């Protein structure tokens, strides 16, 4: 169990208020002792909100393994009936996580203002996997899975007082923050969309941090970042997990400095990604100023449709978008293959990105929730299970569509509407989740793509793809142009498959 040696110092049930200078700056219990003038032999004491009979005690003296409030699960020790609030619960990830956590006996609450539904509607598109109204989803979750979700319709930016009241009511022990606009193209449409995304994402998160400081400072924040914060440095510098490792050194002329623990450089690739970088600094500073605790989840591109919970009944399905604003690349490729649109590669298609399946992303989030950071700790994980060139992904989708489902799939290169390097080095470091949190991928790329074909080829869903097929090819250019991209080349599939298989033999992926 990855978290068995964690202590009450990590636990959100700890009550430090009035016992120590909890709002002091610093990053560790040693700093607490130093600031309070405590000698090594002195005790740092706290109380437990769940076990008041303990009175004042040393929070380092009880581990999760020893505490009766923490029970074994397949993902580590979990706090009994842990209260988790999901912000953005109506979305692709939020709804999936709510059902996933509910099935593990977490007490799930959530908020949403249905922005995602409205943004996709603005594009003229819809989720190709039909989803119900929230009231019907909540009823189905209770009826099918026995999960009761406490939901409120709240805009976290513009209805902060409502959010305050809900947090005071629920007293969440962890908050998962998915309530941001997650689209690079949406942020590049025009000045109004760019300003909206910056305001919605950055100020919404900043307001949340102040509420956590005032209401639930012992709770942990699991904040969704993005691998896109790092960009794709042409120097080939590794994409470390948010901060430089302890032994990293900066050399200049005849001098050198330690970089250990410093935030790594960011090179965002859209105004959306800029908003995520600003979030990173705001969350980092809040942990430093107020002893909040947070994990920044630098997530790769998520793909897929399956978890046991969303597959249990059509009413429990999560959304799946394929339009140019909100459709992610693998999801879009599968939809294109099904309705006969050549899979679209931007430019050369040699861009490399990190990816993770929906089910594995849920596993990762669970492991982070039940392994809270220490007070004042800002932790970062790069949440991916592998990385691939988009060209290789197109071939993988085409092969499965052709060999398993009898589809005639083509691949095309189109103009790249984005400002990005087509060919670049890419060395992501993604060690924290497996080494510190016990994560092991449970589903292969090919298996999840196969599942997607199975679902999206159902007649009703295929028809929904057909209805919105004209919204797949991009018209939003980083330059501000408003026109559909032109085709540069139709790639000969058999030659591309042969090239791909030779590459697999040499490199392994």
Question: Residues of each region from the PLM?
Answer:
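Cysteine-centered metal-binding/redox modules
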Residues: 1-73
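N-terminal Rossmann-like NAD(P)+-binding domain of SDR-like oxidoreductases, especially those catalyzing
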Residues: 73-306, 503-509
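C-terminal substrate-binding subdomain of Rossmann-fold SDR/epimerase-dehydratase oxidoreductases
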Residues: 103, 147, 337-509
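Glycine/proline-rich active-site loop of Rossmann-fold NAD(P)-dependent oxidoreductases
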Residues: 277, 290-292, 304-331, 341, ...
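Structural element of the ATP-grasp superfamily
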Residues: 67, 208, 283, 333, ...
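Short-chain dehydrogenase/reductase
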Residues: 205, 209, 283, 330, ...
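Hydrophobic alpha-helix immediately C-terminal to the catalytic Tyr-X-X-X-Lys motif of short-chain
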Residues: 278-286, 333, 393, 397
């Amino acid at each position: 169990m990855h978290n068995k040696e964690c202590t009450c110092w990590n636990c959100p049930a700890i009550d430090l208020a009035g016992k120590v200078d909890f709002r002091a700056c610093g990053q560790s219990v040693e700093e607490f002792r130093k600031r309070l003038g405590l000698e090594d032999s002195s005790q740092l004491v706290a109380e437990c909100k769940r076990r008041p009979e303990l009175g004042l005690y040393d929070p380092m003296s009880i581990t999760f393994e020893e505490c009766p409030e923490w029970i074994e699960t397949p993902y580590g020790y979990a706090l009994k009936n842990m209260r988790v609030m999901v912000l953005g619960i109506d979305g692709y990830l939020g709804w999936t996580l709510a059902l996933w956590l509910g099935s593990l006996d977490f007490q799930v609450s959530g908020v949403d203002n249905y922005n995602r539904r409205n943004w996709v509607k603005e594009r003229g598109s819809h989720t190709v996997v039909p989803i119900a109204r929230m009231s019907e989803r909540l009823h189905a979750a209770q009826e099918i899975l026995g999960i009761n979700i406490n939901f409120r319709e709240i805009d976290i930016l513009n209805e902060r007082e409502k959010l305050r009241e809900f947090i005071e009511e629920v007293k969440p022990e962890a908050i998962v923050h998915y309530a941001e606009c997650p689209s690079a193209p949406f942020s590049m449409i025009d000045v109004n969309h760019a300003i909206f995304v910056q305001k919605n994402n950055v100020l919404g998160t900043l307001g949340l941090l102040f509420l956590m400081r005032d209401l639930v400072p012992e709770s942990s924040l699991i904040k969704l970042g993005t691998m896109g914060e790092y960009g794709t440095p042409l120097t080939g510098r590794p994409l470390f997990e948010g901060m430089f490792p302890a032994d990293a050194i900066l050399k200049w002329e005849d001098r050198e400095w330690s970089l250990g623990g410093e935030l790594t450089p960011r090179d965002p690739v859209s105004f959306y990604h800029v908003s995520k970088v600003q979030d990173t600094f705001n969350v980092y500073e809040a942990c430093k100023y107020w002893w909040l605790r947070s994990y920044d989840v630098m997530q790769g591109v998520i793909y897929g449709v399956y978890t046991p919970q969303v597959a249990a009944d059509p009413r429990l399905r999560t959304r799946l978008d394929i339009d140019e604003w909100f459709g992610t690349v693998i999801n879009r490729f599968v939809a294109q293959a099904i309705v006969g649109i050549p899979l679209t590669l931007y430019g050369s298609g040699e861009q490399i990105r990190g990816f993770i399946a929906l089910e594995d992303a849920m596993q990762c989030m669970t492991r982070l929730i039940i392994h809270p950071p220490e007070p004042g700790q800002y932790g970062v994980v790069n949440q991916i299970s592998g990385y691939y060139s988009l060209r290789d992904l197109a071939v993988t989708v085409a092969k499965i569509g052709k060999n398993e489902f009898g589809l005639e799939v083509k691949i095309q290169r189109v103009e790249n509407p984005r400002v990005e390097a087509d060919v670049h080095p890419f060395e992501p470091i993604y060690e924290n989740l497996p080494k510190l949190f016990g994560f092991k991928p449970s589903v292969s790329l090919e298996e999840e793509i196969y599942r997607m074909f199975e679902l999206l080829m159902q007649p009703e869903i295929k028809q929904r793809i057909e209805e919105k097929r004209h919204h797949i090819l991009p018209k939003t250019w980083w330059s501000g142009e408003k026109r559909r991209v032109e085709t540069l080349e139709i790639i000969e599939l058999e030659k591309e498959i042969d090239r791909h298989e030779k590459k697999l033999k040499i490199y392994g992926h």
